[in-house]
Every structure is written in C-alpha cells, then in structure tokens.
Amino acid sequence: MSKLMRRRTLITTALGVAAGASGIAVAARLANRYGLIPPDNGGVFGIGETLTYAAQRILMSHHSLAREFSRSEISKVAPVNGDLPETETYQRLLHSSFANWRLSVDGLVARPSSFTLEELKRLPSRTQITLHACEMGWSFIAEWTGVPLNYLLRSVGILPQARYVVLFPLDPWWESIDMADALHPQTLLAYAMNGEELPAPHGAPLRLRLPRQIGYKNVKYLSHIKVVDTVKNIGKGVGGANVEDGYSWYAGI
C-alpha cells in the first residue's frame, strides 16, 4: 500500500472511530485538522455531512472523471426542473439574445474581470457528453460545450487563501463548490447543449456543469462568480440556497 493510501486510510478510520466513540465534536476537530469540514457541518446531520465529504475527498482522486458517453447515447428528451427567472432583468436579456449580459468574476482573485457571452466563446472550450441526474429522480445524457471553470479561474489569478467558488444566477438561487470541484477538468461553464445554443429552460446564457454532483448543484442562468475563503457571511452561511432548504451542500454522485 502506498504512503498516500495509508494516510488516507488512517484519516478515514480515525474519522469513523471519532464519530462512533466520541461524537460530533471529536470527529469535527479531526476533519477540521485536514480542512475537510463542509459548510453545512452543523445541526443534527452535521456529522454525516462531514464524514461523507471527508471520506470522498480522502479516498478519491480530485481528478477522477465522471463517465462520458457517445453521441449515440444522447437522450432524445431532456427534462427541465424549474421555471425561467421572472425578473425584468432576465426577461430583457433573454429578448435581446443576451447581448448586454456579462459574467463578473471577483473576490479572492488578482484580476477581477467581466466577460460577455461572445468573449467566453472565444476562450478555450471543452465538449463532453455526460449524465445530468436530477434530485427529483430523472436523468438525461447530453452534450455540453463551454469554458472549463479552471481555465477561467486561473486566468483571473486565484489567490492562495481561496477555498470556495460561489455561483450567483439571475434569480435568487445560489450555490457554492470547493476548489477541488472548481478546478476539476470536467467542471464547465456551459453555453451550448447538443451542438446548439444553450436553451433558456436549461440555463441560458450560461450554466455550471458539474457532472460529479447531482442536478441542483449545476446552477443555471449564471451572472456572477465570487471566489471566497468562507461562505459563512453569505445567506445563512451554509453554502447555498438549496442547503438552506434542507439539501446537502456536497452532493457527489
């Protein structure tokens, strides 16, 4: 067994023993030592959220890939969860084909920036055919094209203290992911689906594609990305609007 795997096994075993023998406080301290505390670590299910997140990060490579499919496997139907944003701003942008839309990127970056849709399309892109699994029980396979989030973040200069990327859409929803997922090669800012412009119901003009996590983490209608060292001062401090509604912050599949 390699030194890395021995260390991972030791930490995972210690977390489990701490959870069983001494409860939440000891397990939380141990996970915190290795930077493995998720934002939703408090409350009745906090220890479970912490152990799930910590075990995944310890035992799996940050670059393990979600399965990619062939074009022949693309689903004929791609269901949609939720409605279009009803705000005047979104409706105006939609009717102008997002000509005046911009994605702002700020926070713990060296060069805060903003990008038009056309500017994003001129950046290096990635196309992948992956599964979108919704928390409502359905799924579909689609082809997605967009800018790798890791490329965009590196282009603006991530500062060393950065821990999370917060994603704000053109509606009241928001989500956050850790740097491991933000820098993963399959994490995209997608502007196209199945070879066409991203349809509005699927998140136009830009959505997150995070194929290693469940559907609600794949934020649609993006307008703002903020790099932070903590999410405690955003919303209720638990890492996302879905978490505030009772979902897990880490939703790996």
Task: Please describe what each predicted stretch is.
Residues 1-18:
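N-terminal secretory signal peptides and thylakoid transit peptides that target proteins
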Residues 1-2, 23, 51:
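A general, composition-driven signal for non-globular sequence regions
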Residues 20-29:
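Hydrophobic alpha-helical membrane-insertion segments, chiefly the h-region
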Residues 28-253:
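Structured, non-membrane catalytic/scaffold regions adjacent to prosthetic-group chemistry
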